[in-house]
Amino acid sequence: MPSKNPADTVSIYVPGASINSQTASDSTQPAASAYHHKANHNQNRSIEQSAQQAAEQSLHTAETVAPKVGFVSLGCPKALVDSERIITELTRDGYRVASDYNGADLVVVNTCGFIESAVQESLDAIGEALNKNGKVIVTGCLGKDAQKIRDMHPAVLAVTGAHAYDEVITAVSTHAPMPQAIQDKKAYDPKIDLIDLAGVKLTPSHYAYLKISEGCNHRCTFCIIPSLRGDLLSRPIEQVMGEAMALKKAGVKEILVISQDTSAYGVDLKYKTSFWDGMPLKSKFFDMCQALAKVGIWVRLHYVYPYPHVDKVVELMAKPGDRGGLLPYLDIPLQHASPSVLKAMKRPAHSENTLARIQKWREINPDIVIRSTFVVGFPGETEEDFEYLLEWLKQAKLDRVGCFTYSEIEGAVANDLPNPVPEAIKQERYERFMAVQQQISEQKLQEKVGKTMTVLVDEIDTEEQIAICRSYADAPEIDGHVYVDNIVQNGMMMVKVGDMLTVTIDEASEYDLFASYDAVQALA
C-alpha cells in the first residue's frame, strides 16, 4: 500500500527543465494550476508516438526526407485539442512531428495567455526554441498579442492566434516546404482521411478530450478569453457525434467534453436540427448529452455553468458502477459565492442560486460529484465576502475543489477595479480556503471506505506493483487517484492501462483512495 500522501510523479515536456517533475493534489499545486498546465502529462503519448502512429497509415510519410517539425504545447485541455488538430493536419501533409528541437526544420510553439505566469512561460518557451533551433512559428492564445511577441522575439517566423489551424499549416509549408520528390509521389489530396476522424491524440489511448465549441459570450471582468478566442462558436452536432464515435472505435474508454461554456452549446447555431444515425438531432446541450450518453463509454462534462436547464441533464446521468454513459460528475466554474464579488466579476445569471441548484442535483442523483474552481483576493473582496465564501463552501460540501489567488491579466477589466487585495492577504485566504476544503474532501472520501467502485487504469507502477486509477469522481490531471494493489497474482500482472476494474476501497486520504483488486473474483 503506498503512502497516504503519495506524490504524483509526472513526466512532462518543459522547455529548459528536467524531464521529471513532481506535482501534488490540486490543494497543494500553485494557485494558477487550476487553469494552466503543460501538455504532455506523463500518461500522455509523446508527440512523436502519436504522429508516427498516424503517419503509419499514410503512404508518403515513410519518406525520411520529409521535413521535421518540433512541437511545444502549453496551456489548458482546450489548447491541447488545438495542438492535436494542428499535428493531425501536419501529419496528413507528410510532416514528421516531434516534441523536441533536435534536428527539427522549425518549431511550432502553441502558447497560453490566460494569466501572467502563463504568458511568461510562453515567452520563455519561444525564446528557448529560438536559441536551440532558430526557426519558430508561434500560435495559440498569446498569439493574439503578436506585437508583444515580436517586441521580445523579433526573429519569430510567424505569429497566429488561437485555433488558427490553416494559418499555422500555411506558415509551416512556407518556411519548411515539402520536397518536390515527395510532392510528386502524392497521387491524392493530402487532406483526405488517411488518419482516423478522431485525428492524432496527445492523451493516452484510453481517454480523449472532445471540444464541442470555441469562444465565449460572457464578459467576466477577470477573463480575456473572448478577446483571445472570440464569441461562442459551436460545432454542428453531427461533427461532435462523428468524433465521439470515432474515438470509441479507436478504443477510447472515456471522453472529456470541453469548451469555454459547455451548457451554452448550440446557442449560436439557434439549436439547428441535423441528422445523426438517421434520426433528427438538435445542436443543443441536452440533446448532445442524451446522444453522447448512448455512445457506450464514459462521458465526463467540464465547464458547465449552473443554468436551470442543467437539471434535465443530471437526470440522464449513469450510475457510478456503469462502464458507459454520462458520468455523474459536473465541473462547474463557480469562481466565488459572495453576491458582491460575483457582481464585480460580472458572472452570468443564476450564479447566486448555486446552493439551491446543487441541492436539487443531489436530490436527482445522490451520487453526483461536483468539482469547481474559485478565486480569492479578487479586487474589492472584503473579509466579510471571504467569510461568506467559506460558509458557502462548508454548506455546499463540494467533492473536488481548486483555488487560485487573483492576479492581474493584461487586458482584463478587473485590473482597473478599486480596492485591490494585498498579496499577503490573498495567500492567507487561499490557505484558509484550502484547509476547509481539505477537511471536506477527506470526510467525503472516508465515506467510500468499504465500498466497491469501478475504476479506469491510467498507469501501472511495476516497482510498487500498484495500478494508478481514476473513478467516475476523478478527472485526469486535476482530481485525485485510486491506488489499487493486488494486481500481481502468481507472478502475473493481471491488469493493463485502459482496463476497467471493480475494486474495494480500503483506505482514504485527503484527496486519494486506496483499494484492492480481486482478480480471481473478477474472472469468475
UniProtKB/Swiss-Prot annotation:
What role is this protein assigned? Catalyzes the methylthiolation of an aspartic acid residue of ribosomal protein uS12.
- Which positions fall inside the TRAM domain? 446-519
The entry marks the following residues as binding [4Fe-4S] cluster 1, namely C76, C112, C141
Q: Does the keyword S-adenosyl-L-methionine apply?
A: yes
Protein name in UniProt: Ribosomal protein uS12 methylthiotransferase RimO
Catalysed reactions, as listed in the record: L-aspartate(89)-[ribosomal protein uS12]-hydrogen + (sulfur carrier)-SH + AH2 + 2 S-adenosyl-L-methionine = 3-methylsulfanyl-L-aspartate(89)-[ribosomal protein uS12]-hydrogen + (sulfur carrier)-H + 5'-deoxyadenosine + L-methionine + A + S-adenosyl-L-homocysteine + 2 H(+)
PROSITE patterns for this protein = MTTASE_N, MTTASE_RADICAL, RADICAL_SAM
A GO MF term: aspartic acid methylthiotransferase activity
